[in-house]
Amino acid sequence: NRGVYGDYAIVKVPEGQLATAWEVNRTYVDTDVLVSLTKLKSHVSAGISGGLKNLFGIPPSSLYGDDLKDNPDERAVGYRNGTMHECNRAPLTSVRTFTGKGVPGDHGYNVPHFIVDLAAAFRVDLAVIDGISTIQTAEGWWNGSMVSLTRPGLLIAGRNPVCTDAVAAAVMGFDPDAADRTWPFVNGLNHLALARRRGLGENRIKNLEVGGVGIEAARFEYQPTFRRIGA
């Protein structure tokens, strides 16, 4: 949320599709380097969750959270389901920041577009994906028995989050340039391809230089989080 700062910063989104700006903690504009550190896992709305999807944590619950009513609240800690997944309510920002082009109820459309709008506004300098010990078939503890613990024993890092996430997807056994609404993006759009088309990085493995042990040696087959939205 706002933290020690007296106000929020407004960060514009170049060529924003669902968001024209983000109202966020001032740390994100005062910092010299932005590192996205996340776990290697699949995701029901985004297909995979890597350095890009990790940016979903930037918009503060105090303005975007589900536990808000009519006014911003610095005590809020809720998810952003209504504003950024369902698109059935606007955030309580000081200026209008959303375009209104989200599709109500369609996580698979809204989440990928918001991921790219976040990536366009907050340029990641280093993406680190922890696949040493992680989970698959679900996003987190809140999914209960759907979660499967797994130990790929991998650490994936890169200077561009689109490229890094593409390598992560390939290591997981997925095609990072797969068509929309196919594995692993079965419930929606391929946000890696959306990011490439916005000029944010490359998601086609043939165009990437990969160091370390290489994709084939590192491959650890994942099960996609295939639960249909609403099921």
List each language-model region with its residue ranges:
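Extended, low-polarity segments enriched in aliphatic/aromatic residues
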Residues: 1-231
